[in-house]
């Protein structure tokens, strides 16, 4: 009987569509319920991943990078995650696992979580929740505490007019000067112009430049340093006064100190290491190198003109700087050391006859007495290498040496180092080699030295946080 009924049911074609539909409804409902719950779980995971991203980034912001208590760092990340992870549809707010790894100035934060998304069809899946998990990793290097040593060229070549218009005005304004200083683009500073006491009728070219309101390259350098240490500078962080250094120190929550040195034929101390604000009060003492008169740099030591020893300036600063530290706030650590060299890149100095000048220097070199010669050459980078080998960075701003094709001395002594252009010649190449990677900039005559020096400083001082996963 039962067998016959089953066979009859199997061979009966009436209502077969309804029966098939009824039979397939069970897996269809199962699939629909599972799909809906899975989709909702994925959406929750995306939202929780965003919360983990925010928590990781929050823990590597500049203000947090100075925090050495890992419990505080973890608590900050957990609080940010909890605020963003309080989502409807979760069985509870998940508690993240926060891992803090510090390596020197670098900090890596990993925020991971496991959560339970509530299912709308628990009976279909046979479970009340769907588990989701994820993680986010952020890494940043804190801006280190740094000591900055400004090393500024104040040799006579920095007395060039700041722009072509200033150069033209300088040449015109010196048309009545003695023959050695007449129609000259440089505002050289002589204590005894024409080897006589200064007077209303006997002026050096610097006096002429000031009387005619001519801006010199040294003025632009001075203004650039002022922008760094004094301002005005509009800082994104409210309540910060001063210049770029004070602003970046506040933004990075770090400590900067600054020293100012100049060089001509020797190293000159303007301000030893102190706060940028205190150093800024001494900027007015950045002055052009004075000479007694032409061919007499130092009175009673009259031999020839000279006055630019870049390598000597670097060596002098190197002897002053202590061994660099890591720049962290950890006990016993000390700041990093950074040299900022601003120069036109050409040395003009006395060397022993037994020493060597650049092979491309024009020979015979002018003799100075029985033991010395005058050497004009691009910077010899050996002094730079010595500094960098100590772990000290060098930032270089090259105020490009102006090509002077009409000047006989330039054509004979300098042109071979400054071709095919001031941006690409040997002078520029040597300075770029002197600089630490990424810390070289150049500015042509008429360019904005303040902006160039500020950009270079910000490049040294900047730190960023980034998600790596």
Question: What name fits each language-model region?
Answer:
Residues 2-26:
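Glycine-centered recognition micro-motifs in short, flexible terminal segments and loops
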Residues 2-8, 29, 36-469:
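P/S/T/G-enriched low-complexity
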């Amino acid at each position: 009987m039962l067998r016959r009924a089953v066979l009859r049911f199997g061979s009966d074609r009436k209502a077969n569509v309804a029966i098939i539909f009824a039979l397939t409804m069970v897996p269809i409902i199962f699939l629909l319920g599972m799909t809906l719950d899975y989709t909702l779980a994925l959406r929750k995971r995306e939202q929780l991943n965003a919360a983990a991203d925010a928590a990781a980034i929050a823990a590597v912001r500049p203000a947090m990078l100075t925090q050495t208590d890992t419990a505080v760092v973890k608590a900050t990340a957990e609080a940010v995650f909890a605020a963003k992870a309080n989502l409807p549809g979760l069985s509870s707010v998940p508690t993240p696992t926060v891992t803090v790894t510090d390596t020197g100035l670098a900090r890596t934060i990993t925020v991971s979580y496991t959560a339970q998304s509530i299912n709308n069809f628990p009976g279909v899946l046979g479970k009340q929740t769907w588990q989701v998990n994820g993680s986010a990793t952020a890494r940043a290097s804190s801006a280190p505490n740094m000591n900055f040593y400004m090393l500024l060229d104040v040799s006579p070549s920095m007395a060039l007019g700041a722009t072509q218009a200033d150069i033209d005005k300088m040449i015109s304004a010196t048309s009545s000067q003695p023959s050695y200083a007449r129609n000259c683009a440089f505002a050289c500073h002589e204590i005894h112009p024409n080897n006589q006491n200064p007077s209303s009728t006997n002026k050096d070219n610097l006096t002429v430049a000031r009387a005619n309101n001519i801006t010199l390259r040294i003025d632009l350098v001075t203004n650039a340093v002022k922008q760094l240490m004094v301002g005005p500078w509009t800082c994104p962080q409210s309540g910060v006064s001063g210049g770029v250094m004070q602003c970046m120190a506040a933004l990075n929550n770090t400590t900067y100190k600054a020293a100012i040195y100049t060089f001509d034929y020797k190293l000159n101390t303007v301000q030893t290491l102190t706060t940028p604000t205190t150093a800024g009060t001494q900027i007015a003492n950045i002055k052009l190198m004075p000479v007694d008169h032409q061919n007499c740099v130092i009175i009673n030591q009259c031999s020839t003109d000279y006055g630019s020893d870049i390598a000597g300036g670097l060596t002098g600063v190197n002897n002053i700087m202590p061994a660099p530290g890591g720049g962290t706030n950890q006990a016993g650590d000390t700041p990093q050391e950074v040299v900022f060299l601003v120069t036109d890149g050409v040395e003009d100095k006395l060397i022993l006859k037994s020493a060597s000048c650049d092979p491309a220097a024009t020979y015979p070199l002018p003799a100075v007495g029985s033991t010395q010669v005058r050497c004009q050459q691009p910077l010899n980078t050996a002094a730079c290498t010595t500094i960098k080998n100590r772990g000290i960075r060098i930032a270089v701003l090259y105020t490009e040496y102006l090509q002077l094709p009409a000047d006989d001395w330039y054509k004979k002594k300098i042109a071979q180092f400054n071709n095919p252009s001031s941006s690409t010649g040997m002078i520029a190449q040597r300075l770029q080699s002197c600089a630490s990677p990424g810390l070289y900039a150049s500015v042509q005559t008429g360019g904005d030295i303040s902006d160039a020096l500020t950009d270079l400083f910000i490049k040294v001082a900047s730190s960023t946080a980034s998600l790596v996963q």
